[in-house]
């Protein structure tokens, strides 16, 4: 993915992070909204420039629609306030928004409801996760992943999904890795997946990742008192590195996913913060993992 996204600071734009198409659309929409409002223009003004309905303009500014390059230039000309460098950056965002997805090679096993998450995860600066059933995807070994998937997927599909998950895990090992803060139920760690050899290798991997400075892993003990109820089970919170973009909540269901936003997202942040306080401290995680290993 190319470094094309922009952030406004002191009236100018500068390139500073790698964006996938989904995040590029979000940043482009936010910047165009900022230009529109700074110039005192209404949605009706944008509607007149693009000859598109107001509802579509609103979707554009939320990052849910894609503009042609000519349309970006037309809006900038109508709004004013974007110099040559700013226009070049916005056009770069528009190109990136139309670029092939990084996961395109796995399109055959990626359902539409999962596409936004794949883009947002790889662009996130902070990932906070609560997992009640299994080890979080980004912390799984390949053998553990295959054991999980082969339980309920055809062999070929399981292999493809395992390969995709392996690519996703690189986010923790790139030069500027994402920060991961995960809370895992002890019961999830005690569930056997793939036999003893697979389980031992998975625990060894978790012990290793506890030493990574950008990974915080906490365990919610079986005997945790007053553990906060979590309606719907596991969920993930994604924070983009751009302050103008909202946090994203991802809740996977049996045959789909939901992305709560606005007021609907607030309870998830309250819940993850309560879980962090209820779970054992991160400093105790390795000793808890060793205790579980001895029980296998």
Please provide the spans of the model-predicted regions.
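Short glycine/serine/threonine/alanine-rich loop segments
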Residues: 41, 52, 215
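Alpha-helix initiation/capping motif
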Residues: 22, 53, 68, 111, ...
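Key DNA-contact positions within bacterial/archaeal DNA-binding proteins
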Residues: 44, 54-56
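C-terminal regulatory/effector modules of DNA-binding transcriptional regulators
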Residues: 195-296
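A ubiquitous short alpha-helical element
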Residues: 56-61, 256
